[in-house]
Amino acid sequence: MDNCLGVSRYIPRMYQGIHYLRGVAAAAVILKHASHPGGPWERALDAGVDLFFVISGFVMVVSTYGKDIGPLDFVRRRCERVLPMWWITLAIVALLGLGTGDWSAWVLSLALIPTVINSGVGSVYWGVGWTLVFEMIFYAFFAIGLAWRSTGFVFVVLPAMVAVGFAAGRSDVPLLNDTMHPLLLEFIMGALVARLVLAVARPSLLYAGLGVALLAIGAQFAGGTEVRPLTLGLPMALVVAGLAAAELPKIRFLALLGDSSYSMYLLHYIPILLAWSIIPRDSYWAVTFALAIGVGIAGHIFMERPLMALLRSCRTLAATAKPI
């Protein structure tokens, strides 16, 4: 397949830095929710979500580069990766009575369809799922690009959608609101970083240092989600650019955090909310932070990992099965 990226040469076999950054992103979000420090510190921790978005754009380009991947196969793999753990989380949250909304909101959340707009973005039954809505929107446009055999499709269409949102005004329909939201530009930033890494192999670590410096500056400015691509997304894109292909040592705990990042993100607010039913909100944040990390890691080991292994086995069985 024509990669349509205009890059070639060198593709590292393992992006260790990206893997570590996944864990860092999840830990930042958890620390923010456990402590709510307010001010610049809270906005800096918010950047964990922006880092996730940048990483997603990066990974989608790199993982499909030079491969003949059809749109349906791409969507299936993405849904298998995202939805099963999300459904398990929704079930747990509903049983514990921790979600927001009625049964119809829960049902729509199974398909990651937001029902209300909260803080400028579409919201679902379990609060952290708002980011997955953006992920799915990006995947949908990326899959269309694959159908057209051009991953460059997203570089044109997503910015155009955001421009339409600015020109015409934001929609009151939550899903349409998100489809034109500036946060989608962070996925494009990650995709552009992937082009850079694939083209020049090893961008300088100075990019990461510059990204941290810009984050310190951007965190000083309060603003809605519309300005986050500039104040938080751009710094995170530079961090990803600096660390994506860097040769980093194997650090077991960071690798474990990277492996567990999705479960950590989905599950972390459950132990935090349960703890707050016993202790004052935002108190003993170091304890609730550690508890949430532990629950996320346990969720990865005992739920996510076996589930992914089962899905792989089913795919293998389906691929090898022959009609009688």
Task: Go through the PLM ranges and name each one.
Residues D2-Y20, A27-L45, V61-D73, T115-V121, ...:
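Alpha-helical transmembrane segments in multi-pass integral membrane proteins
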Residues Y20-L21, G129, V133-F134, L267:
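Short alpha-helix carrying the canonical HExxH Zn2+-binding catalytic motif
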Residues R22, C79-V82, V295, F302:
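Functionalized membrane-embedded alpha-helices
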Residues V24-A27, R78, A140-F141, G299:
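Structural preference for long, well-ordered alpha-helical segments in enzyme cores
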Residues F52:
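Structured binding elements
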Residues I55, V61-Y65, R76, V82-A140, ...:
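Membrane-interface helix-loop-helix regions
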Residues R78, V82, W86, S260-L267:
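Loop-to-transmembrane-helix entry motif
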Residues L90, A94-L98, A143, I293, ...:
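Membrane-embedded alpha-helical segments of multi-pass transporters/permeases
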